[in-house]
Amino acid sequence: MSRKFCVGGNWKMNGDQKSIAEIAKTLSSAALDPNTEVVIGCPAIYLMYARNLLPCELGLAGQNAYKVAKGAFTGEISPAMLKDIGADWVILGHSERRAIFGESDALIAEKAEHALAEGLKVIACIGETLEEREAGKTNEVVARQMCAYAQKIKDWKNVVVAYEPVWAIGTGKTATPDQAQEVHAFLRQWLSDNISKEVSASLRIQYGGSVTAANAKELAKKPDIDGFLVGGASLKPEFVDIINARQ
């Protein structure tokens, strides 16, 4: 089964109107691979601004959302609000949400369940720390994180999983294409054993750990890598080369 390549750009807490206009201009004028789905994860307050400037075929994602539709949750944003201003995706479970904001596997899974029920597509992030990798616990950690999602997600068609080795985020360290493929292959097998062979064959698994124009082409050749979740490089013109890594 062929899985459509999917590249997400996670701008994190970066950007202002001027820089977003510049990025939008770069993406609008570039020849982007029509066989690659592109999703931009923009700071929530700029989502509507970005939607008006970005090419309409690009998806737009919130970087977080809460597990209920509305209520007394100061500072939080709901999937319904994201949809209302033009987002069609949300990134959930990013390692920074887990590490800095203390989000648990269970909370992230509840967020994913609610976002899907509200009609958003979800980029569901997983990944291990350097300490966990060096202790040989990579598979154990990503299986635990997937297990939490699986308890809440019954229909996977609007889900993309992003494997981000935390030790390779913003550190300049990158998992080699072989290291990345090894974990992606494990995840594919886990899906086959624990969800279904159909989901294993169709679910897209992105790689997200210091992806650059320099390493994207090699990573994109791997059979179980179906795209990227790109951090810092998605704010730069080289993001176009990453989107076109399969060409």
From Swiss-Prot:
Task: Cite the Pfam families for this sequence.
Answer: TIM
Task: Give the signal peptide range.
Answer: none
Sorted keywords for this record are: Gluconeogenesis, Glycolysis, Isomerase
Classification via InterPro entries: Aldolase_TIM (IPR013785), TIM_sf (IPR035990), TrioseP_Isoase_bac/euk (IPR022896), Triosephosphate_isomerase (IPR000652), Triosephosphate_isomerase_AS (IPR020861)
Instruction: Indicate which residues the UniProt annotation says bind substrate.
Output: 10, 12
Q: Which reaction does it catalyse?
A: D-glyceraldehyde 3-phosphate = dihydroxyacetone phosphate
Q: A cellular component term (GO) from this record?
A: cytosol
Cross-referenced Gene3D superfamilies: Aldolase class I (3.20.20.70)
Instruction: Kindly list the GO molecular function terms attached to this UniProt entry.
Output: triose-phosphate isomerase activity
**Alphabetically, which GO biological process terms does the record hold?**
gluconeogenesis; glyceraldehyde-3-phosphate biosynthetic process; glyceraldehyde-3-phosphate metabolic process; glycerol catabolic process; glycolytic process
The pathway this protein participates in, as annotated, is:
Carbohydrate biosynthesis; gluconeogenesis; Carbohydrate degradation; glycolysis; D-glyceraldehyde 3-phosphate from glycerone phosphate: step 1/1
Q: Where is the active site?
A: 94 (electrophile), 164 (proton acceptor)
- The EC number(s) attached to this protein equal 5.3.1.1
Protein's UniProt keywords contain Zinc: no
- Family classification: Belongs to the triosephosphate isomerase family.
Fill in the subunit field for this protein: Homodimer.
**Which HAMAP family does this entry report, sorted A to Z?**
TIM_B (MF_00147_B)
> Under what name is this protein listed?
Triosephosphate isomerase
What's the source species for this entry?
Drosophila simulans
